[in-house]
């Protein structure tokens, strides 16, 4: 079997051009901003004289608005614009770290440093506060921890909604904020230079199973 050739799809032109424009009159907008209403046949002739194309940009206007431009260059600009937009659209990955309502200061600082690093790289993060055994009676501690996380990560993110309980877990989501991250990076660069990467995370232990009491 012959392999099918893959072809790059060119951007589709939304409006009509040249002979496709069949209305009697059009309004031409020139590069200097001036406008002129003329017969379509005259506008096409003008475009040909200038080695340009007559391109309709506002088909619903009365009469339709057109401009004189190079169709090939216009398609190239549209293609470049689409590629630039795709480059800017980064896929967001959800990163998660687990806490307990009685998480000590060292563990809290260690894990929030990693959450902060994830956010600075443009990732969405989820902090999961796990209540083991009868610790679910200390929901207030979990909510206090969620507020501490929110305050600590506020320099690079925004909390996405309120903390939510599901069974014996409390979920807190954070979205990266580019403006905050840029400001944070500038301040950090001025004060201490490039920030060292946080220590590697340990391999998480299997979640403990509850035993009947």
From Swiss-Prot:
Q: Does the keyword Cell wall biogenesis/degradation apply?
A: no
Q: Which GO terms describe its biological process?
A: ribosome disassembly
InterPro entries named in the record: T_IF-3_C_sf, T_IF-3_N_sf, Translation_initiation_fac_3, Translation_initiation_fac_3_C, Translation_initiation_fac_3_N
Q: Which UniProt keywords apply?
A: Cytoplasm, Initiation factor, Protein biosynthesis
The Pro residues compositionally biased stretches are 195-205
Disordered: annotated segments: 188-213
What superkingdom heads the lineage? Answer: Bacteria
Q: Does the keyword Cytoplasm apply?
A: yes
Task: Tell me which stretches of the chain form a coiled coil.
Answer: none
Ranges that cross the membrane? none
Record-linked Gene3D superfamilies: Translation initiation factor 3 (IF-3), C-terminal domain, Translation initiation factor 3 (IF-3), N-terminal domain
Q: Name one GO molecular function term.
A: ribosome binding
List the subcellular locations: Cytoplasm
Entry-linked NCBIfam families: infC
Q: What's this chain's function?
A: IF-3 binds to the 30S ribosomal subunit and shifts the equilibrium between 70S ribosomes and their 50S and 30S subunits in favor of the free subunits, thus enhancing the availability of 30S subunits on which protein synthesis initiation begins.
Q: Which family does it belong to?
A: Belongs to the IF-3 family.
Matching PANTHER family: TRANSLATION INITIATION FACTOR IF-3, TRANSLATION INITIATION FACTOR IF-3, MITOCHONDRIAL
Quaternary form? Answer: Monomer.
What name appears for this protein in its UniProt entry?
Translation initiation factor IF-3
Write down the species. Chlorobium limicola (strain DSM 245 / NBRC 103803 / 6330)
Gene (UniProt): infC
């Amino acid at each position: 079997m012959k392999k099918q050739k893959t072809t790059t799809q060119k951007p589709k032109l939304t409006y009509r051009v040249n002979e496709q424009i069949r209305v009697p009159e059009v309004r031409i907008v020139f590069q200097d901003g001036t406008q002129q209403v003329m017969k379509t046949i005259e506008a096409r002739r003008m475009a040909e004289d200038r080695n340009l194309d007559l391109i309709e940009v506002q088909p619903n206007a009365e009469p339709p608005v057109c401009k004189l431009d190079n169709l090939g260059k216009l398609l190239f600009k549209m293609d470049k614009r689409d590629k630039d937009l795709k480059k800017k659209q980064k896929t967001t990955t959800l990163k998660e770290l687990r806490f307990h309502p009685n998480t000590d200061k060292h563990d809290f600082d260690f894990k929030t440093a990693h959450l902060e690093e994830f956010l600075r790289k443009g990732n969405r993060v989820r902090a999961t506060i796990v209540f083991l055994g009868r610790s679910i009676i200390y929901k207030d501690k979990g909510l206090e921890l969620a507020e501490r996380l929110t305050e600590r990560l506020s320099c690079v993110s925004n909390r996405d909604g309120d903390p939510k309980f599901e069974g014996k877990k409390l979920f807190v989501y954070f979205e990266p904020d580019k403006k905050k991250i840029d400001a944070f990076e500038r301040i950090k660069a001025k004060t201490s230079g490039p920030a060292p990467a946080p220590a590697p995370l340990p391999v998480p232990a299997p979640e403990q199973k509850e035993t009947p009491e």
